Amino acid sequence: MEKFETFTGIAAPMPLVNIDTDMIIPKQFLKTIKRSGLGVHAFDEMRYDRQGNEVPDFVLNKPAYRESSILVAGDNFGCGSSREHAPWALADFGIKVVISTSFADIFFNNCFKNGMLPIVLPQEQVDLLMKDAEKGENARMTVDLEAQEITTSEGDVIKFDVDPFRKHCLINGLDDIGLTLEKADAIKAYEERAAQERPWV
């Protein structure tokens, strides 16, 4: 997993509430176990018509938002089934941060495990960021995880909370495998000691 570093990116406004995981990545794309290649199918049923053509009015199809790395979303983002393909699809599209007033718990946790930062803020602050995101390609925000700050295109600074352990993992690029490998020496020492103490096991 890549280390999460301070970055400046385009923020896309997506005010619709209750965007569920089926809207993020429909069920027909869940056959793969690869994390790459799903970005093209993110928000598939909103992004494309039945003929597979792009829907011009969908926010991520607009020229100003095609390179978005931040989503400012409506309440209860990521609700629905617990498919991990949802954060896979967003990450593969290029999304690094999702900001909302609330998230479904499983989706929220899966974001951290896949190198994405979900940020929960009060409604008034989300409204401010949503308005800023509506500026199109000028809607560039800076996210500083170390300082736990979002800086808008106008220079307004918004503080956010994040669990210290989750923050540590993102900053150091540690997923579950990476966390285990941090303890590789201790695991090896335990296995060697256990083999001597209980050779019959």
From Swiss-Prot:
Biological pathway: Amino-acid biosynthesis; L-leucine biosynthesis; L-leucine from 3-methyl-2-oxobutanoate: step 2/4
GO molecular function, one term: 3-isopropylmalate dehydratase activity
Alphabetical keyword list: Amino-acid biosynthesis, Branched-chain amino acid biosynthesis, Leucine biosynthesis, Lyase
SUPFAM superfamilies, sorted: LeuD/IlvD-like
Record field: catalytic activity: (2R,3S)-3-isopropylmalate = (2S)-2-isopropylmalate
Enzyme class: lyase
Gene3D superfamilies linked: Aconitase, domain 4 (3.20.19.10)
A single Gene Ontology CC term: 3-isopropylmalate dehydratase complex
Superkingdom of origin: Bacteria
One GO term of the biological process aspect: L-leucine biosynthetic process
Enzyme Commission identifier(s): 4.2.1.33
Record family assignment: Belongs to the LeuD family. LeuD type 1 subfamily.
Subunit structure as annotated in this protein's UniProt entry: Heterodimer of LeuC and LeuD.
HAMAP family: LeuD_type1
Name assigned to this protein: 3-isopropylmalate dehydratase small subunit
Encoding gene (name): leuD
